């Protein structure tokens, strides 16, 4: 049911993290991050080149979604309730939901999770316990999606935070067209990448971002 809803452009949100209710949402305007025009801000560009963090995928899905569900400064409430956590853990076990995790000195410093269907990736939420950790996770997600021939990165809603990376807003009808094309694409979500491929994917992303910016 949940996978089918996403394929139709609908996603679940709870009114609050402690709520037993889940609403199904289909915004009139949809936020997306164009994979071929992803912008890497200057400070994040420097951080990515320093390789100070270890990047993992799907090593601790539950820890990531639990961290995303917790209140944080400026955001005392979240929309991830127990039902959503349970469903996404099941989707992860089935191979549909994934994490990109940023680790530092053996600790989970930040990350994100989302759902992969065909060539569409639906970004759900991210968190950060260290400076720029969630941004690093996002950059590594985009690098992986580009390498895996994904066509769409759905951000659900356009936010000021995402706009710095090139996020845009499109009408629902246009989004559904993009979604249909993406679902038919032959794409692969790459989890663990060899260090040289990881570096190459990030280098390609930084080069593309620099070219697009200029």
Where are these predicted regions, by residue range?
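N-acyltransferase acceptor-side catalytic subdomain
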Residues: 1-214
């Amino acid at each position: 049911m949940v996978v089918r809803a996403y394929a139709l452009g609908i996603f679940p949100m709870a009114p609050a993290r402690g709520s037993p209710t889940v609403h199904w949402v289909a915004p009139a305007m949809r936020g997306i991050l164009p994979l071929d025009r992803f912008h890497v801000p200057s400070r994040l560009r420097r951080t990515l080149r320093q390789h100070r963090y270890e990047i993992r995928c799907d090593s601790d899905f539950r820890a990531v979604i639990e961290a995303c569900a917790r209140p944080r400064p400026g955001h005392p409430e979240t929309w991830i309730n127990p039902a959503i956590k349970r469903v996404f853990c099941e989707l992860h076990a089935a191979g549909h939901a994934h994490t990109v995790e940023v680790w530092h000195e053996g600790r989970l410093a930040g990350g994100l999770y989302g759902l992969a269907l065909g060539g569409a990736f639906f970004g759900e939420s991210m968190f950060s316990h260290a400076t720029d950790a969630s941004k690093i996770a996002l950059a590594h997600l985009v690098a992986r999606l580009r390498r895996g021939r994904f066509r769409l990165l759905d951000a659900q809603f356009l936010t000021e935070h995402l706009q710095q990376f090139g996020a845009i807003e499109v009408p629902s009808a246009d989004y559904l067209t993009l979604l249909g094309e993406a679902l038919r694409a032959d794409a692969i979500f790459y989890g663990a990448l060899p260090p040289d491929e990881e570096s190459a994917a990030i280098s390609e992303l930084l080069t593309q971002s620099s070219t697009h910016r200029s």
